[in-house]
Structures are given as C-alpha cells and as structure tokens.
Amino acid sequence: RRQRQMCIRDRLYKEEEIGVFFDIGTNGELVIGNREFLLCGAGAAGPALEGGVVRTGMRASAGAVDKVYLRNGVFQSHVIGAEKACGICGSGIIDLIAELFLHGWIDFRGKLDPGKSPLIQRRDGMYAVKYAPGLFFYQEDIDEFIRTKAAAYTMVEYMLRESGISMEEIARFYVAGAFGKHVSKESAIVIGLYPDMDRDCLINVGNSSLAGAVRLLLDRRVLDDIEGILEKMVYIQFSAVDDFLHMMVAAQAIPHTDIKRYPSVWERLAPNLRQLF
C-alpha cells in the first residue's frame, strides 16, 4: 500500500526517465522504475536510521541533536527546540558519523581511534565519543548503524542489478519519510547510505504516503491509475536473494569497501585516510 502511495505522490509510474523512490521509516521501502516497469521491495532499515537502537538515540523531537559539525576538535551541534541536548536523532547520527570519518576519528570500518581526541573515552568496556555535554555515542552504536546503512544501500544496489540499470541512468532519487526530509545529502553520501550522484537528483519529498493519499482524495481519476500500477509492480523478496548478505557485507564500510563508487568522498579524504583503502 505504501509503495503505491509513493508512486502516486511523485508520478513515478508515468515518467519516461527511470527513478528510484526510497521511503525510510520503520522499514525501508523501495521502488525503482518508470512508466514501463516498477520493481519494489522492503526491508528492515529504519530503526537505527531513526535513532531507535543507539544508547542516546531518540526521535526528531525537542531536545534531539539533529545536526553535528566538528570544528578544530570541538563538536558544534543544533538541538531541536533550542533546548538542552537530551539525545541524538537519525539526521544527527549521520552527520556525526560523517564528521568522525572525514576527520579521521574513525576508520573505514567505523572503529574509533582514542588517540585522535580526549573526547573519545573508554566507557562500559568500549570506546565512545562525547558529542554533547553528558552524551556519548558508543562503538556498538556505530557498528549497528553501519550494518543498517549497509542493508539500505544493498537494497538499492540489488534492485538496480536485477533490472540491469546503472546509477548513471537514474534521473531522480527520491527520499521519503521524516528521516529523508531532514538528513544532509552530503553526510548521507559520505557514510555510504546514498549513492554518490548528482546532488540535484537527490530529492527529499517528506511524507509521501500522506501526500499520495491527499492527491487521491482530490483527484478521483487517480483510482483509475492504481490498477495499472499494480500490474506493473514486481515484488522482490530480499530474504530470498542468495547473495544479498554477501553484497551487504561489502557495504559495511564507510562509505563502501569499493571506494571507487564514491569519487566525491575520495576527493575529500586527507592523504593519511586514503592510505587505509
């Protein structure tokens, strides 16, 4: 149902150019196609991306850190509601991990280097980085987040492979959901959640399900399109894909074990970080 609403919201099913529609919420729901075909699938990619499985994670509400910058060894952040930071939400996590990587505080595996800053401390048997007063982001949080972003990336990669489409053929990459609306495109590319592509082709569309439902209510002719959408849709069951886990393991690096897929990230890396690849 949600995937039909996604198609209705941005008329993917009527476009000549090929597009990708990725709704990141409790689950990751994906559609790739145009007016000729629609491949769709879903997988568990949402909880960590929304801050749900990290120790100090929270939804994007008052008190949540939603933007993070690392300047001269000091974290600067934006807190929703301009209140005291109580935790960190998905967009803040992506900024945090991207900044840690670009400044060499974590390596491509996401492992914290305690020699880089006194803000990286030993807590509860592992390293953690202090990103705000009294708030830490733990090594296990980073590891879980990398696994989750790898699953999301692999869903897109597999669908493109199955359809015989390259990233260069994608005209638009829509990201839906509250998470997609607020996340930094650059940070998401740095960590390997989004593919490295023209930023103008990455479009945040917000709550696509609600927008699709509103469009349906305002234009009953959309009902006539739904049967056509259903006829075009082919569902991919990721759990039944033999090499999905193998592909996901390859994506469990920042941004990816194959750094050639991320030329813009490579250009931003300091020489000592490039030596790690």
PLM region spans:
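Short, small-residue-biased leader/transition segments that mark boundaries at the very start
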Residues: 3-8
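Catalytic phosphate/nucleotide-handling subdomain of diverse soluble enzymes
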Residues: 34-36, 53, 165-229
